[in-house]
Amino acid sequence: MAIKQTNGGSNTIYFEYSSTPGVLVASNEATRKVIVESRKLVGDDAWKRGFDGLAGNSVARQVRKFLSENGIPPNTELDGELVAAYYSEREHDNGVYQDIRFKLVDKENGEGYLVTLPIASSAGQLLIRKLANDAVTRGTKISKFSVFPGNGRKDEATNRVYFDHSVQLKGEDGQEIKQAEGVFNEGIAAVKARTDALKATGFDDREVLNKARNKAIVEFYKGILVSIIEPKFPREVQGESGSDEPVGRPVSNHSEDPDSDIPF
């Protein structure tokens, strides 16, 4: 089902994360059609609420069942040598998509895996914090990479359970690669500074503050990606000149159009 593109004798398979079912999927037209059908199955409103656990008749469980019936597995793990990590920006009819992309290469079978995650997502931000670790360099061997829903947390104000999405990134020794120290707290401080500045000028509208928060956190993590991570993977060394760009739009409407009630 994966897109394969010949590139210097190797094949590149593209992956993106669909957060409503919590599944890492191959990025291609066949997958996109299945995702669109699964969204119709549960309805737009239910889809936009995001991952809701796997108990009972949850939306995520229904979608996963439909995906499995159409050849898309619920769990995907990748491994290989880390050869690229960089900022990517794509313009589409419904906006500009700001992503982190990173590439693993399995030199034994000549296959490459290019993964795209939205910087606005918790999974994308966690991946950036891990790749910012000084121990991660070009050539670092990754024994296991996956993206999956984390533990739920209940918001008392809305009486809803929300799920962050997590990233597993294990090195050659099988140990989880740690987040770069301090980056998480620096991100919180950057967002607080932006929203506090707005509040100080009299803005207290929830929608305005949420937009400011989202913009601030994307800007912060983009800065970490561009200033700390990208220099570890110079493009001229990678030998990449845009040939690893997936064709067309993302498989799942990108960040899944989360509703405005998600707490920040």
Regions found by a protein language model. Give the residues of each.
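OB-fold ssDNA-binding interfaces and closely related basic DNA-contact patches used
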Residues: M1-T116, I128-K130, N151-L198, E207-E219, ...
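Short nucleic-acid-contacting surface segments enriched for D/E, G, S/T with interspersed K/R
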Residues: P73-D79, A123-V147
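Short low-polarity hydrophobic stretches
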Residues: L82, L104, T137-I142, F264
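Acidic, glycine-rich low-complexity segments with interspersed aromatic residues
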Residues: V115-A123
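Intrinsically disordered, low-complexity mixed-charge segments
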Residues: E230-P246
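Short acidic, low-complexity intrinsically disordered linear motifs used
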Residues: P246-F264
